[in-house]
């Protein structure tokens, strides 16, 4: 698939832009702070409904504006769809497909599949479990868009149950008055059922994803660092001893009864952790507490991998995701944000080899020399200037290209 055209309005430093793209490689060149990363961020947002840089939408709305707009026309196997999302300060976002409003923004998920590799990805190896959970869930919803609804339902139940745990703890500390404690505990059992039902679906999806991803990860790491220890991944579940260890083995093939089994195990672990959860007032069981274990040889990558090995593992995770989506039947758009300058010659060559096979690659770089020579690319310059309306970015064709740039009044 490829993005044929995309548009921005009041998205970070871009006040208004419409840009036509073609398959192949396109490079956005500009100094740091001039807005080139914002271009990839906008397309990444259309793909995942999240930013690789910030955890909330507000920073993506240009200062002084009430909303931001990002839209793209995507061509996939000859079929063309246009999607757009409006980020509205203090309100729910709105989305459209071919100019028809959707009931929920998440309905656009899956139309634009992308994989982005950025300097922030080092946190996949060195950061908290939440970074790796997010990696899994974004890849999962890209493959299976309906999983976004499962995740949203799980998060909603988790918030409700967490609030109830705090209430239960307070009620039990006061002692039972008029059956208050019994009522709270009965209500908690109901929410246990909801959490187990949605959590089992999400957990089953993640486990299947790790099974499918593992061989691509091993191969990607081997191609990037052939002299290093072999790389592997394994899912670490908070269900603990309630879950058969076989279920987290990446070699295990998922079965049709997995969700039912996981829901049963979920209930068992919740019952065992009930007192501890009430005492602490937090939910200690579920996919929100899980992790993706990254292993080099027999050692965890976090804390044991060198800087170079950490970069190789982070890059391998992204390339494995790219290979998996491609194996599913469609080339995702590959986006590389200022990463070639961070890599040594071998890793640059390995990344360039994969990029050369992608249907569309979008790259940001500070100078042309940061981009490997083997990637023949159309190039655009990105410049920003300070105005009375704040810092505004503009894009200017450089070199030989027949692509069209439109600046709206």
From Swiss-Prot:
Alphabetical list of PROSITE patterns matching this protein: RECF_1 (PS00617), RECF_2 (PS00618)
One Gene Ontology cellular component: cytoplasm
Main location: cytoplasm
Keywords assigned: ATP-binding, Cytoplasm, DNA damage, DNA repair, DNA replication, DNA-binding, Nucleotide-binding, SOS response
GO biological process terms on file: DNA replication; DNA synthesis involved in DNA repair; double-strand break repair; SOS response
Places the protein is found: Cytoplasm
Chain residues that bind ATP: 30-37
SUPFAM superfamilies: P-loop containing nucleoside triphosphate hydrolases (SSF52540)
Entry keyword Lipid metabolism: no
InterPro entries noted in UniProt: DNA-binding_RecF, DNA-binding_RecF_CS, P-loop_NTPase, RecF/RecN/SMC_N, RecF_2
Molecular functions (GO terms): ATP binding; single-stranded DNA binding
Task performed by this protein: The RecF protein is involved in DNA metabolism; it is required for DNA replication and normal SOS inducibility. RecF binds preferentially to single-stranded, linear DNA. It also seems to bind ATP.
Matching NCBIfam families: recf (TIGR00611)
Assigned protein family: Belongs to the RecF family.
The protein's name in its UniProt record: DNA replication and repair protein RecF
Species annotation: Rhodococcus erythropolis (strain PR4 / NBRC 100887)
